[in-house]
Structure formats: structure tokens, C-alpha cells
């Protein structure tokens, strides 16, 4: 949490991945090339296998209807006008601060912020893939959405931008936090209502550098996800795979993405019960934490990082982080060597708002100077 906030060139498909296009798939209009089995491009994912590799556990809870083809066609032409909505927030709103936690690195294929201050987000909703474009227009928020999930995204726009958050519930007990809150009046805690889209990248971030995790996320989403609906070709936006898509990723592709067996196995266990995990988005924090942590490999760090985004949980404090205890200790007690126990003790006055307190501490800029070299990224690709 403390440290987060180039496209890889396409690889030729392996021989086993060559397959005929799905029946009825045709080349889209407007000059978009059709997906070819052996020539993946930057704008379209490589054709996936129709069966998992040997040893990959079968998918149970998230199996699609019988007859669903594994091979996907290229994104269709986008001449359908988007659905639109305007919303007026009840107070100051800084889109960068609110939406920033959704961004997994500068080249996240599911998230973009462009030069004019517009934010783009590609996601997989309960209604299907969707793309959301959000921009500030004075005191209003203007949004447009494309794809099967467009209506779902626009309906959830206020919650996404923190309409359900109550920043006044936070009472600063330290001058640093009082000043930071005053300087950042547009901070709201977002709520996506989607668990898996935050859970999977959080699992990828376990025990590795953020650069390693971001690289793995980019590789897997671009290769096995789908082009985002709407006018997104120039942005390179992709929607992450559905649960079956994650389960179908061969073991060697996890290896190429530099994801070890422990993390990939955790993701595979999670996607098998994706529907049950998504139910956590409507639960109170203790019940939601329990639901996620029933999956082996998902602990307090991963569940907190997920529910901060999916549920907008103001008390979902991140424990087990390499840097956060020292940052909190330095900011509140001038003790940069604090551990989780000391961090939680310092955050006791903010019970119920501990996640918000840590966000404000990180935004304050009061962080200890680095004393040691950065953690060296691991690399299992050539093993």
C-alpha cells in the first residue's frame, strides 16, 4: 500500500495456441484488424487455449454456460453512442485522489488518466464488460459508459466516487492529519462494489516489489483479457479475464508473467468461488474479511487492500505491509522502526477510520528517508 500509487511487445503464439476463429466471428469495421491465432497485436489479446494445461484444477463455481467458445473475436466496431450521466457531488471532489487507488502502475491496461484530466476505467461488471469515462465539469461530474456493463457503471457512479463515504466521521487527533485533511478536501473513499478486480492484483502484489506485480498484471490482462468496449483502441484499455479465463491460463504463462506458484494457486482457488467472494462487497467489514480469508493464501494484508477498494471500508487498515508501519510510526511518533503492533496502537484514536488515517498520512508527505537500497525484483522467467 505504502509505495503504490511500456507495453510489452506482443509475443507470437505458441503452436498449441493456434486455433481457428470462433464460428461467426467476423472482422470488425472501422479498420480494426481481426484477431489471428498466431499473430497477436498490441490491441487484441492472443487467442487462448480451449482447455487448461495438465494439472490445472477444473473450474467449478464460475463455469459459463455449455457451448461458450474459448476463442474470442476482436472487439466490435464502436459506433454505438455511449450512455451518459451527470452527477453533482455534495462537496469538493478530487478525481485523482478518489480514483487513484484503482491504478495499478503507470501502464495499467484497465485504467488511464489522460492529459485533459479525464479518467478511463475498464472493468468487468455483473452485466458484462464496461468502460467508464469520468471528468470534472465545474462542480459536476460528467460520465459516459460503453458496453454491456454501461448501465451498471453509471448507476454505481456516485458510490464509486465516494457518495457513501462520510469524511466528517474522521476526527483528527494529530496536527499533521488535521492539516492534511484541510489541504485535501476532495479526498473521498471510493467503493467499486466489485471484489475480484481488486483481489486478483492484490494477490499479485504479495511479497514482491510493486514493479514486479504491475508487470505481471499488465502481461496477464493484455494477453488473456479482452479489448475494452468503446473508443479505447488508442488508450490500449483491456478488461481483465472473467473467472473462467483466469482458470484457463496455462502454468507456463504464469511463469512468463513472473508469478510464482503460490500466488497463481491462490488466484486459481479464488476464481473457483468468485461468486461467493463477490458477495463480500455488500457485507460489513468483519464479515467481508472473514469471507475473503477463508481462501488459503488470502490473509489480512490482501483482504484489507481489496476491501478498501471494493467496499470503501474506512477502517480496513493494511497490516503486514513492509513500509506502512514505519511511515505511520514516523509521522505520528517520530519512530520509523515501528511494527504492526505499534502502528495499530498509534491508530487507536482513529478506530473505525484507520484506513482514512493512513491515507492522510501518506498524502501528508511526511515519510522517513530511505536507509537501504530498494528491494531487488525477483525473476523466475528464466528458471
Map each language-model feature to its residues.
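Acidic, glycine-centered low-complexity repeats within long intrinsically disordered regions
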Residues: 25-27, 31-39, 43, 49-51, ...
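HhH-family (HhH-GPD) DNA N-glycosylase catalytic core used in base-excision repair
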Residues: 1-36, 72-383
